[in-house]
Amino acid sequence: MITNDIDKLSPDDFSIIFIATGGVERLVIQHFESLPRPAILLADGMQNSLAAALEISSWLRGRGMKSEILHGELPETIKRIFVLHSNFVAQRSLFGMRIGVMGTPSSWLVASNVDYLLAKRRWGIEYTDISLDRIYEYTDR
């Protein structure tokens, strides 16, 4: 994709950034705000593309952005792309959904709390607390 077209991507587009050559690192990071998240970088190993992808990935991760480099044997790379696409489709299908949370974790469970805001940011999911009293009302009918 030509960098002028990067703004035409929507969150519903599954995107892979093909790093065809070295020397494009600065160009990619100039478009940091427009990059798909997570950033999937495809390097073919020619023209210093792998080195450039590693440099870009390191820069992105240093700024808290997830990235993955696809590189290696073609059949495995293709399989990985299919997995990433399936994950993308599944994640997009969750966007806008509401999940009812019944009850709360016991106080002795120190790692079982759900960060509602983080889930909304990552997946577009809204959690709604449902009291157990409300559940009992429906089951007593």
Segments from the language model and where they lie:
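An N-terminal assembly and electron-transfer interface module characteristic of large anaerobic redox
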Residues: 1-141
